[in-house]
Amino acid sequence: MYKRQVYIQTTPGTFATIKIPDLALIGNRVIHRAELIVEQLYDISDSTFRAPDLLYLDASDPSITAAYKYRTIPYDLAIDNTGGLNLLSFGSLPTMDVDGGGNKIRVWKFNLSRYVQHILTGTQSLYNLRLFAPFSFLEQYGLPPGADLTIPVNINSSVAKGRVRVGGGNHPTQRMRLRLVYSKL
């Protein structure tokens, strides 16, 4: 069931599970860009209670045998040359925009292009995604199936600092959505 609003709070707060079941039915295409767009819903209290600095998206992988069943988004979230994750190009840092009422809001655009391409070509499983605002945690990193590394991930600078309301899949004007730019083969 789609929700109109999704509430995300920084660790030890809340998370949202995102399911895109029809993605696997699209068929083989060349993906130029695939992005999950998440828009903040404005509220007057946003000036008092600020949004988290970063949001994070990972994947629930039932094939992981460890107790922690989440992994980085395959192919799109990578360790860069400094040893950190490419959170900026992945979309964890929001951009500022304005909503239909002229209010300043944050918009996150998570880059899922390579992950979606592998789903459509049949080389990658479709996972449920988890959207949250963690402080730090352990994550499985690697390309499934195969040898994974368990890596520590640090996202936000402090615990319990930040909350945000975002549009869910059923919001009338600021719907959470997967935007695909593709070419047919």
Task: For every predicted segment, state its role.
Residues 3-185:
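Secreted, disulfide-rich extracellular signaling modules
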